[in-house]
Amino acid sequence: MASATEDPVLERYFKGHKAAITSLDLSPNGKQLATASWDTFLMLWNFKPHARAYRYVGHKDVVTSVQFSPHGNLLASASRDRTVRLWIPDKRGKFSEFKAHTAPVRSVDFSADGQFLATASEDKSIKVWSMYRQRFLYSLYRHTHWVRCAKFSPDGRLIVSCSEDKTIKIWDTTNKQCVNNFSDSVGFANFVDFNPSGTCIASAGSDQTVKVWDVRVNKLLQHYQVHSGGVNCISFHPSDNYLVTASSDGTLKILDLLEGRLIYTLQGHTGPVFTVSFSKGGELFASGGADTQVLLWRTNFDELHCKGLNKRNLKRLHFDSPPHLLDIYPRTPHPHEEKVETVETTETSGRTLPDKGEEACGYFLNPSLMSPECSPTTTKKKTEDMSDLPSESQRSIPLAVTDALEHIMEQLNVLTQTVSILEQRLTLTEDKLKDCLENQQKLFSAVQQKS
């Protein structure tokens, strides 16, 4: 159990939006924070003292989702105006816009390598876009209601999505097929995501629950009922050991996934909390909600997570359902004193590219937004001295083989650990059997002596 000195604390307070915060993301370098709001604006906050915050103007309706690209030089946003925008996260805030769906777009998510972007919409579809080719690739259709969220797995092989049809679906990005389906008869998931190792998914439920599923064996591992309102968002700590949740009951809760219990309840917002996210290093996390404020928290408790790495690996191999958390009482809530951060804002806007439709052959990126993640020129320069293969499919073969080998090695590692655990259990069983036989022999001898 963490001591009081390791409690998370409120570090900074940001206020600049005029309506509820819907989504936020911390930059990969940990120096910036992007927020989206019902006020139709994006804001980019800099963590340097007395630094300006930049307000990005362009969307015509609620901004529903925002995310930094893996290298931090692009910012993607989704809106109820049915568009997705790609911004350069600087003072000028140049952007490109494309009409992504025929209904409001609910989420955007970059693949870990930055080559693809997934969008989820109320038109019941998930769409995948190539940042390399700068165009639409394919749609995923199987949901029968609004799709609220879609996320890539860390290796990019899978996409997980959740919908108001009360299902969570796992998609194979290679064959574009739904390979698994989790159903719920009570409520639907507002948010879903993979853990950093890609072995599990967690869902934030409208029925006040948080569920963790193992995608390798398609089994529910953990089921938390610790909120008194719908759960709107979750975020995994990079160590895989912790999960932070945001709820309409106005609280944030931190779950210890190794021990399967609630360890912190954080109170700082004065209304429903809609979004929360850990930084890439896990030392910070940010939250936003209906009170229009953004809170930046210092994690603290993650300093000891390295000690539990071996325990974590063993935990992943144990598929028995853990105790249900209905009877687990949380710690005393930790109200934190607000530290108001006054931030000067600068209005910025960008140039809109003409809409060419999702099937158009034209590029959807403004050339000025080209980055190492999506630039064909950059990629060509990196590879021209390594191969002269003429076709794109031929160039992708070595990468596919490498990914397959890495996946095989991961599975072999899991099997090795599984065998080790089985050997330990077998040894314990043999010891217990030996004790039983010895006790039986003693009882038999005692009976013979009495007779």
UniProtKB/Swiss-Prot annotation:
> What keywords are assigned to this protein?
Cell projection, Cilium biogenesis/degradation, Coiled coil, Cytoplasm, Cytoskeleton, Phosphoprotein, Repeat, WD repeat
Outline the segment boundaries, as ranges, of region: Disordered: 372-394
Q: How would you describe the post-translational modification of this protein?
A: Phosphorylated in mitotic cells that may be mediated by CDK1.
The UniProt entry annotates WD repeats at 16-55, 58-99, 101-139, 142-181, 183-223, 226-265, 268-307
Coiled coil feature spans: 404-443
Q: Tell me where it resides.
A: Cytoplasm, Cytoskeleton, Microtubule organizing center, Centrosome, Centriole; Cytoplasm, Cytoskeleton, Cilium basal body; Cytoplasm, Cytoskeleton, Spindle pole
Give any Pfam family that matches: WD40
Any one annotated GO CC term: ciliary basal body
Q: For this chain's UniProt record, which GO biological process terms are given? A: cell population proliferation; centriole replication; cilium assembly; positive regulation of centriole elongation; retina homeostasis
Sites where Phosphoserine occurs are at S321
Q: Which domain of life is it from?
A: Eukaryota
> SUPFAM superfamilies from the entry?
WD40 repeat-like
Q: How does it assemble?
A: Interacts with POC1A. Interacts with FAM161A. Interacts with CEP44; the interaction is direct and recruits POC1B to centriolar microtubules. Forms a microtubule-associated complex with POC5, CETN2 and FAM161A. Interacts with CCDC15.
What family does the entry list? Answer: Belongs to the WD repeat POC1 family.
According to its UniProt entry, the function of this protein is described as: Plays an important role in centriole assembly and/or stability and ciliogenesis. Involved in early steps of centriole duplication, as well as in the later steps of centriole length control. Acts in concert with POC1A to ensure centriole integrity and proper mitotic spindle formation. Required for primary cilia formation, ciliary length and also cell proliferation. Required for retinal integrity. Acts as a positive regulator of centriole elongation.
Q: What is this protein called?
A: POC1 centriolar protein homolog B
Origin organism is Pongo abelii
Gene name as annotated: POC1B
